[in-house]
Amino acid sequence: MPYPFVLPTTSAFSFSTSFSCESHPSLPLNASTYRGVVRDTLKKHKRLPPSSQSSSLSLVVASINDYLRYLLAVDAGIAHRSPHGGHGEQIDVVLRSAPAIEWRPFLSDSAVPGKEPPRVRIQSLEHELFFTLSTLASALSLQARAALQPLYVVSVAVPGPEQRLAAITGATKLLLDAASIYDYLSTRSTSLSGPAPCADISPATVSAQRSLALAEATLLAVFKDDPYPTVVAQDRNNLDKDWMFKAPEIPKVRAHLFARLCLAASEHAAQASSLCQAQSSSGGSASGNGGGKMVGLMRNATARGLDGNFIRYIENLRRTARAKACRFFAIDAELGGQTGNAIGWLRAGLQELGVEQREATKKSGGLSLSRFTKEWSEKREDRKVEKGARWGADAGKTEEVRVIEMLDAKWSKQNDTMNIQAVPTPATLLAQMPSGRDMHTVKPYEPPSLDPVVLESMRAPPEGSDDFENASDSEDEGKDNNSRGPVGAFPGTRNEYGRTNSSNSYY
């Protein structure tokens, strides 16, 4: 269910070219070394097929955490303070020149459809920290997706209750860790002097991602004890042998509690959606201020808003959360013997999802183009889940439609034959919705810090150099074959093997 982020890539950078440390001379060299590991890990992760990328996420997270220790030490040294807060030895870092670092945005809208947005050049260590922490939070969200993927695969045996509980609990913890990182960035963004170089690390986007991660974690708390998605998944699973499985009844109090939790998730998603739309509208308005300097495809990255797929995902998550709340209100009403109100709540949920009532309640007699299209889209989504590709881009909307349609068909049949209760309109029921109830609290993020022994060892002069001036680009390797020497040649002797102007003739 979490959003399928695409991790960014970055260019090579040498800290020694822009920073010098008098108290700990080896700090810039070590920071460059660990940043090179992050750059190489992100490059290798991007080149992997989608089915294999989940296995490298742990390496990405570990490399970023190792690099953050040195990056935060350099950041503390610029302010002439200790990286351990109020205690510990002080670091003195001098800024020699503005750093020139490039990052590829992963949430900004692209000027050319179907292509990646161009790289953004940053000249601030604060923006480097924002990109690094945002990448870490995105990697944690992707780890949560990888943990939840086995619960949605219908071509293998259904995981047991213990495996399901462990997967949801682990994914919830990862999402809350990501939310704490975004909360740390949101607090730190208040001290920024200039505008963000792109929409990915702007204060509005960071706050929106915090709300999004909190909404996803809240829905997972409901999903942990919600038996109906499991019933629908088992019904679609050909390998499931327990075909007579009956969904356990949810107590009335818990159904009402789950509904309020879903409403809280909907409120968080609505807040994230408004922040993203404000960011996109401000980005769109900024594109007209540049005059002739921002023509065609050469417009500035700061003038572009967020990716439309990301904004649509947040809106779908808001709709899905409200539809889940309507479903739990329906379960609460059905447990109380109010079948008519239960059916009305289900139809209110379909209205929130944008599904027309006539399509959800009509009899399945004969062939229908809409029915064929729906089955084809469901099979395509199942293949995405099996391959580990960009599944769940609809934020669980299709799954919730299946659950509501199953309950609507069951209760409508009971109401037509036995109860015969009046079904209220969705507008009447939606006006009675209570407020949401939060379950999770975002804990303060504790950035990693260098061990005092390691920090003391960097008082020694550096051994070697961190000059990455001739380092190849992370995505452009192999594109410029002219810069490489012939196979088997000794480094630095390329000109001796090349053909000069005087040797163009055969003799």
Swiss-Prot record:
> Which segments carry the region annotation Disordered?
437-507
| Matches recorded under SMART domains | BRO1 (SM01041)
Q: Which GO terms describe its biological process?
A: cellular response to pH
Q: List all Acidic residues biased stretches.
A: 464-478
Q: Where is the BRO1 domain?
A: 1-294
Query: So what family is this one in?
Result: Belongs to the palC family.
What task does this protein carry out? Required for the proteolytic cleavage of the transcription factor RIM101 in response to alkaline ambient pH.
Q: Know the name of this protein? A: pH-response regulator protein palC
Organism listed in the record:
Pyricularia oryzae (strain 70-15 / ATCC MYA-4617 / FGSC 8958)
Organism phylogeny: Eukaryota, Fungi, Dikarya, Ascomycota, Pezizomycotina
